[in-house]
Amino acid sequence: MKSSHTTLICIIMLSLFALHECEKMEVKEIGRSSKIILPACMHETCSGGFSLKNDCWCCLRLKTKQARCWKEKEFPNAKELCFANCPPLE
């Protein structure tokens, strides 16, 4: 048997084991594990053009972008400002 066949068989066996474990879970456990918790603020790219550098902190719960982002150049404590001004999750 080729090594690619062996690898494929291993992947299938692991998948079947994972599927079997999911089958044993109760509905309550699935509901709890499927919740996605987003932070109030995220480190994002605000500079124009193509940039991979995150240069500001933005609140995900405010409506307008001007009111919700703090650039690190203008505000050295942008992270603290964001978390202080962003409303908590309900």
From Swiss-Prot:
Disulfide cysteine pairs (residue numbers): 41-58, 46-86, 56-82, 59-69
GO BP of this protein: embryonic axis specification; suspensor development
Tissue specificity field: Expressed exclusively in ovule embryo sacs and in early developing endosperms.
Top-level division of the source organism's lineage: Eukaryota
Signal peptide residue numbers: 1-22
UniProtKB keywords: Developmental protein, Disulfide bond, Signal
Phenotype when the gene is knocked out: No visible phenotype, due to redundancy with ESF1.1 and ESF1.2. Simultaneous down-regulation of all 3 genes by RNAi induces embryo abnormalities.
UniProt xrefs under Pfam families: ESF1 (PF18209)
Function as written in the Swiss-Prot or TrEMBL entry: Maternally-contributed central cell peptide regulating suspensor development and correct auxin distribution in early developing embryos.
Family statement drawn from the similarity comment of this UniProt entry: Belongs to the MEG family.
Protein name: EMBRYO SURROUNDING FACTOR 1.3
